[in-house]
Amino acid sequence: MADFVAAIDQGTTSTRCMIFDHDGAEVGRHQLEHEQILPRAGWVEHNPVEIWERTGSVLATALNKTKLSTSDLVALGITNQRETSLVWNRHTGRPYYNAIVWQDTRTDRIASALDRDGRGDVIRQKAGLPPATYFSGGKLQWLLENVDGLRADAEKGDALFGTTDTWVLWNLTGGHRGGVHVTDVTNASRTMLMNLETLDWDDELLGFFDIPRQMLPEIRPSSSPEPHGVTVDWGPADGEIPVTGILGDQQAAMVGQVCLDAGEAKNTYGTGNFLLLNTGENIVRSKNGLLTTVCYQFGDAKPVYALEGSIAVTGSAVQWLRDQLGIISGAAQSESLARQVEDNGGVYFVPAFSGLFAPYWRSDARGAIVGLSRFNTNAHVARATLEAICYQSRDVVDAMAADSGVHLEVLKVDGGITANDLCMQIQADVLGVDVVRPVVAETTALGAAYAAGLAVGFWDGADDLRANWQEDKRWSPTWSDDQRAAGYAGWRKAVQRTMDWVDVD
C-alpha cells in the first residue's frame, strides 16, 4: 500500500502542496505565492490561470523534492480559500474574469438590498448566512450582470461557476478534456445558495440572485471513497491520484485539529481569523452574528455542523504595518516591537479595512486607530495590532457562548500568527482560557489529507487522528478579571467609532 497522502492548500496569498505520512507528520512541501490584484478600493481579485499554474507547479515540485511518485500516494485532498468565486468556459477552460476574492466588497449594494426587502431572512434560515459581500452568491450575480456575454453562455450551459476547489479539481482531472465539475458541502455552504438541510442548491435562493442552476457544480461529501475525480496522467502530477477529500480551509483546519466532537473549537490565524465550534448534527442558528455552516460530511454519514465567526483582517493587519506604514520589516518584527511596551498605552486599532465581519456584519465600517496621544510610539501601534487580533476573537467567543451555551475551557489554535508568542499570550489573557498550539501547525493541509486518507482506509477513523494530535505549546492567562474587563471595554468603544463611516445604500 502507498505510504503517503498529499494535500493541495489553495490559499488567499499562496498555494502549497504538502505530503504527510500515517503519523500526520510532514514529509515534504512546496509553496508559491500569487499576485493580489487590487483594481480599485475595496476590490480584490486573483488571476485564475496563475492559481492553476501555481497549483500544478507545487504538486509536481513537492513530489520531486521528496523523490516520490504518484504511486507512493494513496490519495489527494484539496482545501481552499472559501467564497472566492470564478466562472470559466467549459469548452476552452478560459476564465471570463478574474476570481473575485472573499475579501472583495464590490457587492455591498447587492447585500444591502437583500436585507432591505426581506430576502435576507430567508437566506439566514435556509443557508445559515447573513447577506454579506463575503459570500459567493453576490459575487456570481455581479459577474453575470457585468461581464459581457456571460449570462448568455451560462443559460446555454457553456459557463461553469466554482470556488477555487472546483477550479483546481476541474483542471487536475482534465479541464476542458473531461474535467469533473464538483464541490463539497463545506464550500457550497458558503455561497448563500445551498440549503443546509437538503445539502443541495436551493431554487428559491438561486432565484434571489438570478443564477442559472446549470452553472453550478455537483455537491458531494467532504470525504468520499468514490473519488471526486482522478488526476490525469498527462497533468502536473504525471500520474493518476484519486482525489477523495475536499474541504474549505477552515473546515479542513477543524479536521486537522481533530475537533470532531460537539463543543470542540479551534481558531485559525491567517489573513483573517476563523473561529469554529463543532455543534454536532445540530444546526444551531445564530442570533448573535455568527454563521451556521457545514463542518464536514464523511461518506454517507450525516453532516456535522458548526458555528463560525469569520474575521476579515488579522494577519493582513500585520502585513499592513509592514507594507503600508513601513514600521516593521517583517511579520516577526511585530512581536519584538510590541514587546518594547508593557501595554497598549490607551491605543486601539480596529482593522476594518473591508468593513467588520462577525459578529457585527457592518460593511459601512472602516479601519481606525484611536486613543492616540503624543506619548504613544510605533511600539504601541504594533501592540494594538496584536491585541486587535485577539479582541476580535473575543467578540466571536462571546457570541458563540450566547448561541450555544458552550463556554470554552481551552482554545486550539493554528496558522502563521501562532508563531508569535506575545500574540498568543495576549489571546489567553483576553479570553481568560488556555490557548494550545499543536506540533503540526499546518492543520489546514493536514485536515484535507485526513479527509482524503479516511476515505480510502489509510486512517481507520477518528481515534487514529486523535492519536496523531500532539500539543506543542500552551499559554495560560495572566491578567486579572479587572484587567480583562477594562481592556475589552476599551475595545468595544473603539469598534463603535468605526461604524457608519461609508455609505453603502
From Swiss-Prot:
UniProt pathway annotation: Polyol metabolism; glycerol degradation via glycerol kinase pathway; sn-glycerol 3-phosphate from glycerol: step 1/1
UniProt KW keywords: ATP-binding, Glycerol metabolism, Kinase, Nucleotide-binding, Transferase
Annotated control of activity: Inhibited by fructose 1,6-bisphosphate (FBP).
A single cellular component GO annotation: cytosol
EC number assigned by the record: 2.7.1.30
Binding-site positions, ADP: T12, R16, T271, G315, G416, N420
Residues that coordinate or bind ATP: T12, T13, S14, T271, G315, Q319, G416
PROSITE patterns xref list: FGGY_KINASES_1 (PS00933), FGGY_KINASES_2 (PS00445)
SUPFAM superfamilies named in the record: Actin-like ATPase domain
Catalytic reaction list: glycerol + ATP = sn-glycerol 3-phosphate + ADP + H(+)
Tree of life domain: Bacteria
Classification via Pfam families: FGGY_C, FGGY_N
Keyword hit for Kinase: yes
InterPro entries: ATPase_NBD (IPR043129), Carb_kinase_FGGY (IPR000577), Carb_kinase_FGGY_CS (IPR018483), FGGY_C (IPR018485), FGGY_N (IPR018484), Glycerol_kin (IPR005999)
GO biological processes: glycerol catabolic process; glycerol metabolic process; glycerol-3-phosphate metabolic process
GO molecular function: ATP binding; glycerol kinase activity
Class of this enzyme: transferase
Amino acids binding glycerol: R82, E83, Y134, D249, Q250
Main function: Key enzyme in the regulation of glycerol uptake and metabolism. Catalyzes the phosphorylation of glycerol to yield sn-glycerol 3-phosphate.
Family classification: Belongs to the FGGY kinase family.
Name used for this protein in its record: Glycerol kinase
Biological source species: Mycolicibacterium vanbaalenii (strain DSM 7251 / JCM 13017 / BCRC 16820 / KCTC 9966 / NRRL B-24157 / PYR-1) (Mycobacterium vanbaalenii)
Source taxonomy: Bacteria, Bacillati, Actinomycetota, Actinomycetes, Mycobacteriales
Gene encoding the protein: glpK
